[in-house]
Amino acid sequence: MAYTKIHAIKATVDKAIDYICNPEKTDEKMFVSSYACSPETAAYDFKYTLDHCRENSPNKAYHLIQAFAPGEVGFEEAHRIGKELADKLLEGKFSYVVTTHIDKGHVHNHIIFCVADNIEHNKYHDCKQSYYH
């Protein structure tokens, strides 16, 4: 079973996206996907959406990490699961970049998504209690 954790990004969205898209970790970017943005311009896209947001918050994005036990899943399956998680969690409202890192002994996904949705420009509400239900 996968282990998942999430934390807020308050400043360096561009550096976080550069890190998760590292070609050495993602098989030359084979395991990089996105929704409603391009990985190359996601930080700018997120900023544009945030500039139109109704709520003010220090958070610019969220970084979700989904780690699998060694041998639990293959690279392609892990990436598919990461995209499915992002789609289900964000309901097609938030831009995101999902990558699968394959450079360690365990496969793991990184999902960075904009804190403001693309439709009504409302903020994502991170309620940790809801993740356990």
Language-model features: where?
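N-terminal nicking endonuclease/strand-transfer module with a His-rich metal-binding environment
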Residues: 1-133
